Amino acid sequence: MGSTSDPSPSIITVAAEAPVTAERKQNLHLQEQLAKPYVARALAAVDPAHPNGTEGHEHHNMSVLQQRAAFFDRNNDGIVYPWETYQGFRAVGFGVLTSILGGFLINLGLSYRSQPSWIPSPVLSIHIKNIHRCKHGSDTESYDTEGRFEPSKFDAIFSKYALTQPDALTSEEISTMLQVNRNLLDFIGWVASIAEWRLLYQIGKDEDGLLHKETIRGAFDGSLFERLEKDRASRTKIV
């Protein structure tokens, strides 16, 4: 007869016949660190260090995914055009060529799914109210299919892949995560995830080549982009 102190098989997170479950760990104490981490948050990208989301960041009653997309809505009309995506890329520090490609490819890929009708947009507009339809596969699942933020999925990025530092990812760790997250035959999702994470790494890594948890969290709700734009504007004024 087993000891009463032995954990129930129903909550054990490692299976001996599946070594990968030991390699990619879960945070067994997340519920002690953050209230109801299993509940997807509609308005705030939360973690144990930010239980109320990003301080000073306005949600405007948008989902977390909508908040991210709204940064690129430069005239706040609820629609993102390719030239606005370009402007958003430039605002956070990307070069002209990357911004042109981003403006075209992102809007090309997301426009139709976000349209309010079956008629395509000739100018590749993206409607923010329908941005949840544009969620691709092979991702971290930190957004759910309605655009809410999943705290437990976000935390798993670091419990599973942050082996060098607990709250940051190296370039190699990002590559591992991207490979692991690939869904079978989901070529579009593979490419989209690689592009998103490599672009984020380019603008968000520190001098040691680490992409920190706070930087990544800010990318999910768009607050990182707002901060980068303000920092660039401040430097321009000084010059």
Curated annotation (Swiss-Prot):
This is Peroxygenase. Transmembrane regions are predicted by sequence analysis tools, but these regions probably constitute hydrophobic domains associated to phospholipids. The proline-knot motif may be involved in targeting to lipid bodies. It comes from the Eukaryota. PANTHER family: OS03G0222600 PROTEIN, PEROXYGENASE 3-RELATED. The modification N-acetylglycine is found at residue 2. It catalyses: RH + ROOH = ROH + ROH. InterPro entries: Caleosin-related. Binds 1 heme b (iron(II)-protoporphyrin IX) group. Keywords: Acetylation, Calcium, Endoplasmic reticulum, Lipid droplet, Membrane, Metal-binding, Microsome, Oxidoreductase. Its cofactor is heme b; Ca(2+). A motif (Proline-knot) lies at residues 116-125. Belongs to the caleosin family. Its main location: other. Homodimer. Calcium-binding peroxygenase involved in the degradation of storage lipid in oil bodies. One of its GO terms (cellular component) is endoplasmic reticulum. Ca(2+) binds at residues 73, 75, 77, 84.
